[in-house]
Every structure is written in structure tokens, then in C-alpha cells.
């Protein structure tokens, strides 16, 4: 799963920073901190950084200001090294600052330091065991590192805390499906689409699992829901077209393949299947054009030459062009015995 790392601002109750004679300095530092917080919410990152540096200048032992400054550096200015330093300073001043450990872990992820990221996220969870964002980030980290067992465990822990966590439901369902645990995956994804009926990826994954199980009616409905939720979902349109073609629903299938190539003009397989459908519809000119486009896109696609050869042989009754096309199919590694026999007999 491929998610963008986003640093989050923790809601921190500052209270009374200092007592007695230093209260005015504390108030001044807090004023700049609150000003920085407001500027962050407005997207004014340069101004926010300046306000927070003033707060720290007035009150050097101000962990919340360092933490927010780290967020500004990371999110607003992409100064990741400076962000990491700010989070480390916040942690130095407040070793129980779970949010600072969490955001430091996210910075390490962006910097490509997975070991360090894991350490910081675990520290955040040691302080705050029910820290959902940290648990989710840790699960994603494990998944990116292909540590599927650890990822499954982390996602399961998160769902135990929050059963309606949509990202975790999808991620764990995806992992289970990749491990061949189809029923467990289906259960999670079904829960997800009940919570969010327009979750296109969940519908699509349910469709692919149903298709693998040869439950084509179920797969068809899932793909239809996927494209309804996301009309530009290329693979869902393609898979739906393939199922409709297998059912003999030629015009709806052709429409799905046309939509596919409109969305992704270099989708050779979609052009090839569109050619098959056109041939079955006796739209021979359109079929030939679709096959030729397939070969233009994928000149070494043996299956495209096979289908074009069949088209010439059976639909156009053009044995000469069929033979030329079949020869190219065999040159590219095709192994169909009937085609091999035809080409062999001509040579003799």
C-alpha cells in the first residue's frame, strides 16, 4: 500500500509554563506559540516558523514549540533534517512526548530509514499503547518492508482498538488475499464496503477474488460497484469487459473495453479483447484495426498475432495473411499445435 506520510499536530495543553516572576516570559512564549499554531492552520509556514523560533528564544525549554516547529519544517518546508532535529529536541525536553516520537518516525520513513522509523514508532506506542496513528504507521512500514507477518499483527491490533478503521480493514484484507487467505480477506472487505459503500478498491479486490473462485456473477457486481464509485478505474473496466465477453454480452463488453483504452490508450490487452469482441459482432474493419493497434503497442506479443491470425483465417477467409501472421506468432514463441501443423504443412 502506498500512502503518503503526513505529519500531524498533536493537541497539547500547555497550562502554566512557569510560575512566579517568570510568568510574563511564559505568557509571551505561549503567545508566539499560539500565533504559530494559527499560521500553520492558514498554511503560512514561513511566518509560523518565525513565530515558533521566537517562542523558543524566549523559553528554550519549550517541547511543544519544538514539536510544532518540526511539523512546519517537515510539512511546510520539506526540511526533513531540521524537522528531525526539532523532534529530537522536543523528546529531549519531554521524554514522554509520544507525538514527537511518532512524527520523528514518520520523518525517518520519508528519509528512507526504516530501522530508525520502527524504533521511534515503537517508542511512541510504549508511551501510548492505544496510539492509533502510530500503530497504523508501523503497520504500513512493515508492509512496505514486506514483513507481512508483522504488518498483519499490527493491523489486527489496530482493528482490535478500532474495528471501523477503514484503511486498516482494506490493508489487512489486501494482505490476507495476497497470502491466499481468501475467506478472511473477504470478511474484512465486506465489513469495509458496508461502512463505505463507495470504496472502489475494496469492491475491485472483492471482484478479483470472486473471479478467481469462478463466481462470475459476484465478480461482475463487484466490478460494477467499483466503476460506479470510481469511473476512471481502468482495471475494473477491463475486468468487467472480460466477464461480459465470456457471458456473450458483446456490446456491453465492447463498451467496457472502449472505456478502458480511452482511459489508458496504451493498454494493449484491452485492444486485443476489443478486437475479439468486434470480430464476434462481425465488425471486421474495427476488429482488424483493434488487432493492429495491439501489435503496434506490443510488437512482441505472441497472443496478439495468434488472435489476428485466427481473425484472418476464420473471419476474413484470407489464408495468405493468416499464414504470415501465424509464422510471426511461432517466431515469438507461440506453441499452439494446430498453428504449428498448418505452418509445417505449408513448408512441406
Where are these regions (language model features)?
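Terminal, low-structured helical/coil segments at or just beyond the last alpha-helical repeat
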Residues: 30, 306, 311-348
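Structural marker of alpha-solenoid helical repeat scaffolds
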Residues: 58, 93, 127, 161, ...
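Helix-start (N-cap) detector for alpha-helical repeat units in TPR-like alpha-solenoids
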Residues: 28-30, 63-64, 98-99, 132-133, ...
Amino acid at each position: 500500500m502506498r500512502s503518503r506520510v503526513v505529519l500531524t499536530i498533536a493537541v497539547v495543553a500547555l497550562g502554566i509554563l512557569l510560575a512566579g516572576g517568570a510568568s510574563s516570559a511564559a505568557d509571551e512564549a505561549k503567545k508566539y506559540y499560539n500565533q504559530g499554531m494559527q499560521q500553520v492552520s492558514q498554511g503560512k509556514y514561513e511566518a509560523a516558523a518565525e513565530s515558533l523560533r521566537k517562542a523558543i528564544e524566549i523559553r528554550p525549554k519549550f517541547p511543544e514549540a519544538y514539536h510544532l516547529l518540526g511539523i512546519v519544517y517537515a510539512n511546510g518546508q520539506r526540511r526533513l533534517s531540521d524537522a528531525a532535529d526539532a523532534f529530537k529536541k522536543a523528546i529531549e525536553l519531554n521524554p514522554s512526548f509520544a507525538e514527537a516520537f511518532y512524527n520523528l518516525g514518520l520523518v525517518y520513513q520519508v528519509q528512507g530509514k526504516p530501522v530508525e522509523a520502527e524504533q521511534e514508532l515503537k517508542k511512541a506506542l510504549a508511551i501510548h499503547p492505544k496510539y492509533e496513528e502510530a500503530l497504523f504507521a508501523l503497520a504500513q512500514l512493515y508492509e512496505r518492508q514486506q514483513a507481512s507477518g508483522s504488518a498483519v499483527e499490527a493491523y489486527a491490533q489496530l482493528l482490535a482498538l478500532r474495528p471501523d478503521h477503514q484503511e486498516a480493514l482494506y490493508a489487512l484484507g489486501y494482505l490476507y488475499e495476497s497470502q491466499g487467505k481468501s475467506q478472511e480477506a473477504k470478511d474484512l472487505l465486506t465489513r469495509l464496503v458496508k461502512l463505505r459503500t463507495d470504496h472502489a478498491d475494496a469492491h475491485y479486490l472483492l471482484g478479483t477474488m470472486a473471479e478467481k473462485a469462478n463466481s462470475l456473477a459476484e465478480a461482475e457486481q463487484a466490478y460494477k460497484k467499483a466503476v460506479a464509485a470510481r469511473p476512471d478505474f481502468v482495471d475494473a473496466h477491463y475486468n468487467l469487459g472480460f466477464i461480459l465477453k465470456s457471458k456473450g454480452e458483446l456490446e456491453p463488453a465492447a463498451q467496457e473495453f472502449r472505456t478502458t483504452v480511452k482511459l489508458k490508450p496504451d493498454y494493449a490487452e484491452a485492444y486485443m479483447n476489443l478486437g475479439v469482441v468486434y470480430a464476434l459482432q462481425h465488425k471486421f474493419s474495427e476488429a482488424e484495426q483493434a488487432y493492429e493497434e495491439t501489435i503496434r503497442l506490443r510488437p512482441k506479443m505472441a497472443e496478439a498475432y495468434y488472435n489476428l491470425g485466427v481473425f484472418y483465417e476464420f473471419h476474413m477467409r484470407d489464408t495468405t495473411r493468416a499464414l504470415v501472421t501465424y509464422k510471426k506468432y511461432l517466431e515469438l514463441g507461440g506453441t499452439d499445435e494446430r498453428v504449428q501443423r498448418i505452418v509445417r504443412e505449408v513448408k512441406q
